[in-house]
Amino acid sequence: MNQASYKNFLATIAPPASAEVLGKWGITTAQLLTSKVEELILPIFNEMDPNEISIYAVGGFGRKELAPFSDADLLFLTTERIEISNTIAALWDLGIKPSILVRKGGELITSVKRDLKFATTLIDARHLYGFELPLLLGPKEWIEKARPWFHREQEYERRIRLLKALGAGCQEPNIRDGRGGLRDLQLKHWLLKISEKHEMKSDSESRENNNILLGARTAIHLAVKRREDRMLLSDRRQLISWLGWENEDSFFQSVMLAMKRNAYGKKKKSDNRKHLVEEFKSRLRDVPLRPISGFLRLLDETGELELLLPEWRRIEGLVRTDSAHKYTPDEHTLRVIENLEALFQTQNNEINLSYLQRHDLLILAALFHDIGKGTGKNHEEEGTKSAVEFTKKFGFTKTEIERVSFLVRNHLLLSYNAFRRDIDDPHLIHDLAKKIGDVENLIMLYLLTVADLKAVSYTLWNDWKARLLDTLVSRLVRQCSSYLPPELFAKEAIIRRKATVEDLLSNSKSAEYISAHFDSVDGRYALAHTPEQIARHIQLIPELKKNAVVVERNQHPVSNCIELVVITHSHQGLFAEIAGTLSALDFNILSADISTRSDGVAIDTFRVSDSNNIDSSRWNSFVEDLKEVISGADNVENLLNKIMPYKKKSVGIKTEVSVEIDNESSGDYTIVEVMLPDEIGLLYRIASVFRNCEMSIATAIINTESEHGVDVFYVTDNSGKKIVKKNLLKRLKEKMLEIA
């Protein structure tokens, strides 16, 4: 049989019929693959002298747990040095990937003492060809003598392995190497084999979990046609298509639950719900003096949390398609509660946390905030229903129930508006404050938001997002206390900023410039910029008398990025020109703020990251290129064409493509949300579509952190009004989708 026929054999393997038979299918298929590989390789071994060599199947091959594209682990024991290169080449020609260890028979004991990996391979050694060594028969006396060493070395190896591989509770676990994966089960199997009672058998649940993971690993290999031991979201569609199951979630949830059971051991069975409820009530009353997260995690590990909260079983091991989430909803929820307890012990210089009085209600909201994800419906509303039912049964008052319900229903409110809406818009601040109601609601929602974001993944939360959220909440605290109309809120912001700027620029010559400047800007500009930034704008604007474009760069005081300020005369397509020039010099744009004075002076601020650092040469190139583009001496397309041949597009999860238009949230602007695959010059092409549709960008919120980032634009027509014509909005969507 040649390599092609082996691949044809793999193509004949039918998928399991359902999650219920995944384990049985997994072990049966692994044994079938093992037998097939043995059938292929034994004729090759028959050409060797059986008196000179002994060949053993080891590792997964030795256990008869072979996966389609995993290595066939072989141990060659020889009496003398012999030539095996032709044998190895013949194995590769079959389409089998051999992993071969070669030892002289007399070197075995020395190798075992020196090499833990080699020692463990011998535990499952299975004779295939040639002479047999008595040392590899029966219980492993040779390793029993070194049992303490074996335990110690295996634990060290496991700690190193788990640092590299995601496991139970993670959305994209490594089924082989992660916590609760096949390697953990193999370790348990090895320890049983070398225990004092080596005849003791592993429990049936461990065997079933092992078989489920074998089935999952085999299914992934066959579906994606390569060795892949991780359950990647990018492979999900291909895997679902190969399986052909009606219930798409059942495969992933079966795997996650098997890994969870492996990680925590056998679940306890308890029918004493009354005692459990009383203990939960007692611990909830003691928050924050006595943490409750450890108690809840223990209930989760023992399987008793679903006795307290039946909806919990729906989210256990549930894998969602959102690649931003590192953890499954059950693990994520427990981490949110742990994060809250940490926040209870911290101080925030920007936000006064003393408004928080009911820590217990916040813990309850965290427990229910994602519980609705198990229904497949709107998880905020479904979670709210569950929270209301639970708190009623537990005897909470109407006011307490309403507060918990508010938090669950609106747990995404602050993050959505902080990162996908213009927080410098006075109308937004007014509307949000009205919806939130009081400062205690706000502070509880703020803490829940921070804990939630930190529990999504360790990369999602950063200083920049913390600053945006703190800025929004600080403004909302003020608004919830005063309830100023948007116009007065904006006017107050201008007055406060102007007074501070006058202190910064305290000379008679500046007074005239300051008054003229604040007379020509709006409240949004005053909120968007610090007094120090505004003072610098006032100093730079007079330079327009000498130069058509004034450009300055500064290190941002909070986030690790560079702030570029471009001051020039406003014109159609200015945003596209700046964005395109930045892209052509390989700057990564994080955010952009576009402000235009009533006299037509544009003050545009771009925050960019640059892994290559901006040296004086690159900075001068940017300034010169921008001047030429704005003057018409050059164009962005020419600049981009110079670097495109040298830049590669990144390959990752298939990005959803969408363009959404919101004409309800803002009184003055049409909000356009764009989700397109990231590439060099994308922001320029998006801006060019707006320009070609005769629309002006007022604000841009750029998301560059994940494949599913949404860029948000506040736009108007050329007369500064919202875009309401349906045919123009339809054309905008069509043109945006054309650049995908």
Residue ranges and their predicted role:
Residues 64-86, 241, 328, 352-482:
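Divalent metal-dependent catalytic cores for phosphoryl transfer on phosphate-bearing substrates
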Residues 38-82:
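Active-site nucleotide-donor binding segment shared across nucleotidyl transfer reactions
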Residues 34-42, 81-134, 155, 403-410:
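Conserved catalytic core of two-metal-ion nucleotidyltransferases
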Residues 1-51, 69:
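N-terminal regions immediately upstream of nucleotidyltransferase
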Residues 4, 16, 145-271:
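Conserved nucleotidyltransferase catalytic core and NTase-mimicking acidic/glycine-rich helix/loop elements
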Residues 20-33, 168-177, 279-284, 314-335, ...:
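Active-site flanking loop/helix segments enriched in acidic
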Residues 212-213, 253, 258-275, 294, ...:
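Regulatory modules associated with amino-acid/nitrogen control
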Residues 35-56, 190-201, 324-362, 382, ...:
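Alpha-helical phosphate/pyrophosphate-handling elements in metalloenzyme active cores
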